[in-house]
Amino acid sequence: MKDKILNALKSKTFFALAINIVIMALIIGVTAFSYDSADDFYNSLYICQYHNYYNNDINYIFATITGSLQYILLNFNCFVLFQILLSCAAFSSVTFVFADKFGKHKAFIFTLVLNILFSFDHYSNILSSKTAALLLTAGFLMALNAIRNKRYSLPFWIGVLEVIFGTFLCFKYFFVGLAFFIAFFIGDMIAKRYE
């Protein structure tokens, strides 16, 4: 049992989650939340307060999950909570992929640079289309990493879930993410050929 706990603490998954949760907590501690557009404010209002799940922007399934959870967590805005947690999951996925490919030290530096550039905006200015783009990118990157390493285990399915949730938040970014996935996949196949 002790070995399993030590192995879990040394794993790339724990590394990715721990570093991104710490960064998320620091940013949340020093900033205040705001909506980047009025659309997300109204989506949040309709879904979490009025429980109106039919929306042109947000998928019905995601709106139903968010609104139903709002009945349980009365003191939190679940729309904002989901945006923050999904952003943290996406940043953690990108960190995991880089730790898997380049090692923990390079992944740590990359994660710091990535979070300095993007996480402040994701955690303080809530916008569902930004979160969707981040989720789709991270999800496709996780899936590509799993396909490349021929490991169709938990990271692959987490990548698929991130793509699904990213599509739920903003469907129009799915094809942009898919184009990047295809470009990464072709580039990776070419790089493998010359190894």
Per-region residue spans from a language model:
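Short hydrophobic/aromatic helix or loop-helix immediately within or flanking a transmembrane segment
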Residues: 53-77, 81, 85
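Membrane-interface alpha helices of multi-pass inner-membrane proteins
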Residues: 154-176, 181-182
